């Protein structure tokens, strides 16, 4: 380990000598073709259940990747709120950066990083906007403070200080204290229509198991990929 001294107070800053040395072996077990159901959602459901049972923090958290009009990728963590044969659902401010990206380019990638279980799942697809009634039903299932929070933030816009948000939140909390919080016109959701899913399971000696499901009309083609 090397030490550097802070120019302000002389406190040593300890940094890894070489982050390339940070590694570990993956030993929790492999994934074999005989383990695979015909439908990737069945395996996803099994793995998600196991992630919940393992008490992972935020097991439904997924990295959502979009690209802007210049082709610049962006990522952020969003919570999965529903999935079925139609696709995977998340909600957002429709004035946000990701919503603008998806308006121009509906292609999207999701990644579920279940590190403790030595697993990850990547989903590729395209989005479609959710119907208003579906959005309304979910919005009113949220805690009331979260509903108010949706009104407060003009997501991805520049603000001068956190106090701007806190003041607006208190103002709206007072306004809606005795009634229902209406659905903001700028708040909605997307369904990711799935084109392909890749399941990754860590393996010993970096011989990881990767299986790629590709939609083929009514069925799924399954291929093993080299690690």
UniProtKB/Swiss-Prot annotation:
The keyword Transcription regulation does not apply. It comes from the Bacteria. This is Pyridoxine/pyridoxamine 5'-phosphate oxidase. InterPro entries: Pyridox_Oxase, Pyridox_Oxase_CS, Pyridox_Oxase_N, Pyridoxamine_oxidase_dimer_C, Split_barrel_FMN-bd. One of its GO terms (molecular function) is FMN binding. The keyword Flavoprotein applies. The gene is pdxH. Substrate binds at residues 23-26, 81, 138, 142, 146, 206-208. Catalyzes the oxidation of either pyridoxine 5'-phosphate (PNP) or pyridoxamine 5'-phosphate (PMP) into pyridoxal 5'-phosphate (PLP). GO terms for biological process: pyridoxine biosynthetic process. Homodimer. It catalyses: pyridoxamine 5'-phosphate + O2 + H2O = pyridoxal 5'-phosphate + H2O2 + NH4(+); pyridoxine 5'-phosphate + O2 = pyridoxal 5'-phosphate + H2O2.
